[in-house]
């Protein structure tokens, strides 16, 4: 790595984002969103259905097939009755990123277990988050079909809703439901399969069966991996320099088949979303670890936050193919079909991309680690595309428009 980004000031990645530019709702037809095109320094636009026109026929497009599941919150009434509250969709604010960053108050559409025991009143739970005592309350609002509006409030302005979910939320679906919950398809990608995320990988929300069919007809190969999106994805950067920001750990799974496709399509990987980017780039560093320590344990394969910036010149010279082949060899030795590990990687200016050659992604919040990732990919040219998007009525954040970035 050429540079160490630890002393980058997050204020350098700020831009004005008026509230009216944040998409409050998805479009009725997903693939009719606008598509900003950044190709070799030039910016233009089209509609998302035209995406296949801008990709070479021999590209390998990688999707994150994680499926959003409800965060489960437990409360006990004074009578002792257990109430389970499942967060289904953010309501106020209705953008995932903004909702997770709320302090003191957030509203969600929730499914409620043991509803008959919660006819009225405010649920309360005392808890400790980041070493700080906190009282979380939940108040039931209007009914929407089988779900209810729930207002969450807490009494510590230093704690975000993401912090609460990470400590207080549980992911598994309770067995007593004995059925699929009524999910809002708005929050799932059409190719979602593996349950485990508390938020959707939103870049994938633009894809429809007809866009996927058009990509296949073009000759683009489609492959999948899994990174479960945690609430920590939306953790705001509060330190002046990014050295003071601790990245969240996320769990990843990549099959032997996907690894072999990446090897066969060297230099042609198109990542759908920043979660796919982080997973693919983490694979390189996992491979480098295995080349140096072939008997590394699953825990030792975890990619630490600053690991990419601490490589020796010899380690940094490992080719992407050699790194990927080292993972395949590891799977062979252990008679495994899928790599399961975790990553805490931070991708920021100074990072040298090893595997990803193009990215499909939405427009991200000011002063976010996702914006750092985009800046690193475009070698600092992010302002050009964000200025264009703001000037040409693009919609921002989770429900916003898309972009195809090819440096």
PLM features: residue spans?
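Surface-exposed, charge/polar-rich loops and edge strands
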Residues: 1-407
